[in-house]
């Protein structure tokens, strides 16, 4: 008779308590599926996926978006993951995936609510808030369409342009600017995960 698998009771109610890794793969918890106008996010206090916002008509999420459990990014949330897969998943779905890189960026918020005190010299200290907001890029383990994608360089240049355009418009909806800092490889992505794990443990 086979032994029963050990389960973490907390993870059954809170997916953010699942392990971020399964062997050599990361475990991505989907929040918002590809093609969706609704932005969903996991509410840690209430233990449920909640609607955060609705994108304007004609604007949808270009890929499945989720997070890695037991991590903490610079923006105060678990580290974000953009997941490449054949068809959209659903909120709360656990998907094993392999990292291929990271999209590094920062969001810029004008705390004064206008341009007067923006980046001009002599403006009030703290008038502009910059926050790193990186997104890991991963490929689902179960995929046909993206099976040959092993690194970011395997993706067409148009993919990056469309991704950058989406985030510029997405952050603009909240009155924030988005600056793309660049793309880095799978090793850099893994380093980001380890740093986010360390931050979560020390919280």
Where do the language-model regions lie?
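Hydrophobic N-terminal alpha-helices or hydrophobic patches in metabolic proteins across all domains
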Residues: 2-203
């Amino acid at each position: 008779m086979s032994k029963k698998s050990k389960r973490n009771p907390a993870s059954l109610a809170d997916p953010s308590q699942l392990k971020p890794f399964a062997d050599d793969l990361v475990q991505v918890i989907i929040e918002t599926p590809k093609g969706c106008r609704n932005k969903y996010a996991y509410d840690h206090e209430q233990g449920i996926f909640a609607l955060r916002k609705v994108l304007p008509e004609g604007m949808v999420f270009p890929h499945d978006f989720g997070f890695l459990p037991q991590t903490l990014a610079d923006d105060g949330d678990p580290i974000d993951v953009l997941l490449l897969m054949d068809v959209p998943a659903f909120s709360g779905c656990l998907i094993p995936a392999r990292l291929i890189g990271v999209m590094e960026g920062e969001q810029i918020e004008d705390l004064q609510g206008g341009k007067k005190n923006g980046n001009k010299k002599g403006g009030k200290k703290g008038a502009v808030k910059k926050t790193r907001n990186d997104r890991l890029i991963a490929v689902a383990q179960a995929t046909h369409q993206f099976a040959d994608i092993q690194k970011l360089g395997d993706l067409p240049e148009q993919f990056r342009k469309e991704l950058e355009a989406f985030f510029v418009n997405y952050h603009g909806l909240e009155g924030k600017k988005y600056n793309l800092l660049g793309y880095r490889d799978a090793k850099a992505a893994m380093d980001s995960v380890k740093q986010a794990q360390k931050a979560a443990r020390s919280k």
